[in-house]
Amino acid sequence: MAQENAAFSPGSEEPPRRRGRQRYVEKDGRCNVQQGNVRETYRYLTDLFTTLVDLQWRLSLLFFVLAYALTWLFFGAIWWLIAYGRGDLEHLEDTAWTPCVNNLNGFVAAFLFSIETETTIGYGHRVITDQCPEGIVLLLLQAILGSMVNAFMVGCMFVKISQPNKRAATLVFSSHAVVSLRDGRLCLMFRVGDLRSSHIVEASIRAKLIRSRQTLEGEFIPLHQTDLSVGFDTGDDRLFLVSPLVISHEIDAASPFWEASRRALERDDFEIVVILEGMVEATGMTCQARSSYLVDEVLWGHRFTSVLTLEDGFYEVDYASFHETFEVPTPSCSARELAEAAARLDAHLYWSIPSRLDEKVEEEGAGEGAGAGDGADKEHNGCLPPPESESKV
């Protein structure tokens, strides 16, 4: 609640209107989208490996157990059928009879022999003889198929274990985004950090604005995506993420927030999705971390608290202050109005020396121009920074 009050200026007529907007991307990076009424489910089977990797762990383990158990049962049944078809089960006590598999006296024995064959743990007193060509062919088929099942299932488990999803959990985003002046220009900023000592290689950052819009033809687009520039043209989107960094989106004429003042921003309805990508240094696999900011998570007139201090021979990062912000003097007008006010201020500096005739005309029109001047001053004052405050969030 303190954060919400800090974002509200006492000079405003009313606090920002709260909304129950449904997130498109959760704060932990999960995409809040479910695929429904998928009729062509056979497409999942065409990419069975990815389907198994994407399954939940309990389902993956269940499939892992079933894959081995069913193959053992299947080949065990075939071994039993071979013994039954050859009449081996009817000559169990006949020492002169040469069976296909020695000491295979029932289905349980055939099942155990199937396990011994596929897992290559070694035969005991059950062993195949050279008088059974169909058994030799089946032995070769089970050995080949067993190797394929092992490769497939072990590969699935390895990929599932080594997925970089957990690595993304140690990439953190600030709980709020802020809007304040940087080098005299309004900027939308958020902070990212890496909790691990091993770094993300080739890290890059992207930001997208998610909001609804209506086209000139009347088409309604509920989740229209717009890129927010975070330094693609200058290379600032390529990060050396050793310590926490503040990512800045300059609100210029190409920004969708160019005409958004503080009050307009608080009344707007949007979601900012931020995406951090890079390669895990230990494995070389691509990792992606995501987060998002709703309207009430964007603090106007705030700046992030510094978390980096210089100690004896090293820099120390204090993650206890990672999400903290503090208020700074920031204009409440839009970036466009701020640029226009700055342009008018620069124009006064280069005003030419008027002639006597111009002075006379100005004296005659002094009364008429007073009202317009007051209006311009009011407009300019709307872009002045608010009183400085030291309250922290």
Swiss-Prot record:
Pfam families assigned: IRK, IRK_C
Cytoplasmic side: 1-57, 157-393
Region (Disordered): 1-23, 360-393
Intramembrane segments: 107-118, 119-125
Record field: transmembrane: 58-82, 135-156
Chain ranges for the short sequence motif PDZ-binding as given in the UniProt record: 390-393
Listed GO biological process terms: regulation of presynaptic membrane potential
UniProt xrefs under InterPro entries: Ig_E-set (IPR014756), IRK_C (IPR041647), K_chnl_inward-rec_Kir (IPR016449), K_chnl_inward-rec_Kir3.3 (IPR003276), K_chnl_inward-rec_Kir_cyto (IPR013518), Kir_TM (IPR040445)
Annotated catalysed reactions: K(+)(in) = K(+)(out)
GO cellular component: inward rectifier potassium channel complex; parallel fiber to Purkinje cell synapse; presynaptic membrane
Record's keyword terms, sorted: Ion channel, Ion transport, Membrane, Potassium, Potassium transport, Transmembrane, Transmembrane helix, Transport, Voltage-gated channel
GO molecular function, one term: G-protein activated inward rectifier potassium channel activity
Subunit structure: Associates with KCNJ3/GIRK1 to form a G-protein-activated heteromultimer pore-forming unit. Interacts (via PDZ-binding motif) with SNX27 (via PDZ domain); the interaction is required when endocytosed to prevent degradation in lysosomes and promote recycling to the plasma membrane.
Family membership noted in the UniProt record: Belongs to the inward rectifier-type potassium channel (TC 1.A.2.1) family. KCNJ9 subfamily.
Protein name as catalogued: G protein-activated inward rectifier potassium channel 3
